[in-house]
């Protein structure tokens, strides 16, 4: 118990002044100061088949069958909210976030204290005319498999940012379902693999209605004999004209023995659309490195400066927050 309390105190150090929070331990909410803005219920769930009929993956089925508890977090008012996960025992975590209509929400989800092998499923439903800034930070020390799905309704605006800094094998799946018209989606994903192991990312955007727009950018870094596999799929269904889909992947391979594999794909079944994708993977530009070293920096310091600039979009207007400072200290 003493050790758990120490971890919770450490987790609370990531919370800024006047920020609302929920702390989860092994998938259960154990502490919050957001009861005016948020309702937390156990073993009640949104039926997402009311919004989209699809086949669940084997991982989703496994988590549904084995998670001891399912938690629903219902956001009812405008809020700046941080959700922090502490986990050292539960193997399966299953929860949902339901954001009501016409809200302005800044939401941060932190997996920074998950030390065991965990399989996690998060489903997020954003009702119409809401503006959501959603930030994630992953720091798994055990082997982790994460499936996160967003279901966006009409006139939504979602700005999604994530940073992966895991020290073990990791499989991440992110699904963005644009279900109704006039949805604007911006995604920034930063993946850092220095674990010496293989990490996989499957990043999917589905345009399932006309007049939707998405822009997905991934910045990847591999070092220390690590492998990072990134698969992007952007899909526009038939009958969904006037969609705009963009995706881009950039990668820096820091050492000789690491590798980044990027596999972008567009599946377009409609003519009246705009869609583009691209991938650029390679070592640090030697001319830039040489220039910095000629100014008196060591090779290591030069590489560090280049990488910090490379991932800086994640920290825009965020580097001075408690979590921003924590992450920057971790990746130095």
Feature-to-residue mapping (PLM):
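Short, surface-exposed loop/turn segments at secondary-structure boundaries that line and modulate
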Residues: 307-315
């Amino acid at each position: 118990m003493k050790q758990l309390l120490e971890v919770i105190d450490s987790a609370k150090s990531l919370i800024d002044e006047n920020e609302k929070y929920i702390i989860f331990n092994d998938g259960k909410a154990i502490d919050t100061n957001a009861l005016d803005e948020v309702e937390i219920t156990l073993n009640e769930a949104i039926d997402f088949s009311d919004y989209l009929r699809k086949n669940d993956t084997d991982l989703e089925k496994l988590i549904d069958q084995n998670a001891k508890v399912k938690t629903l977090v219902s956001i009812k008012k405008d809020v700046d909210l941080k959700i922090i996960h502490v986990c050292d025992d539960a193997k399966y975590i299953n929860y949902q976030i339901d954001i009501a209509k016409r809200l302005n929400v800044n939401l941060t989800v932190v997996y920074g204290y998950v030390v065991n092998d965990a399989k996690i499923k998060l489903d997020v439903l954003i009702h119409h005319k809401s503006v959501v800034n959603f930030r994630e930070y992953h720091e798994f020390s055990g082997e982790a498999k994460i499936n996160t799905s967003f279901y966006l309704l009409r006139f939504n605006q979602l700005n999604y940012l994530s940073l992966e800094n895991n020290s073990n094998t990791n499989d991440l799946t992110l699904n963005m379902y644009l279900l109704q018209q006039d949805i604007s989606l911006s995604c920034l994903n930063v993946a850092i693999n220095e674990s010496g192991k293989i990490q996989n990312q499957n990043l999917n955007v589905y345009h399932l209605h006309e007049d939707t727009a998405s822009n997905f950018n991934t910045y990847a870094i591999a070092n220390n004999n690590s492998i990072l596999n990134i698969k992007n799929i952007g899909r526009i269904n038939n009958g969904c004209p006037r969609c705009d889909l963009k995706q881009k992947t950039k990668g820096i391979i820091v050492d000789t023995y690491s590798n980044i594999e990027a596999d972008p794909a567009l599946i377009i079944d409609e003519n009246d659309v705009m869609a583009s994708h691209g991938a650029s993977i390679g070592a640090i530009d030697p001319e830039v490195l040489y220039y910095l070293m000629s100014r008196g920096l060591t090779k290591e310091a030069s590489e560090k400066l280049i990488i910090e600039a490379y991932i800086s979009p994640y920290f825009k207007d965020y580097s001075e927050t408690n979590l921003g400072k924590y992450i920057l200290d971790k990746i130095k």
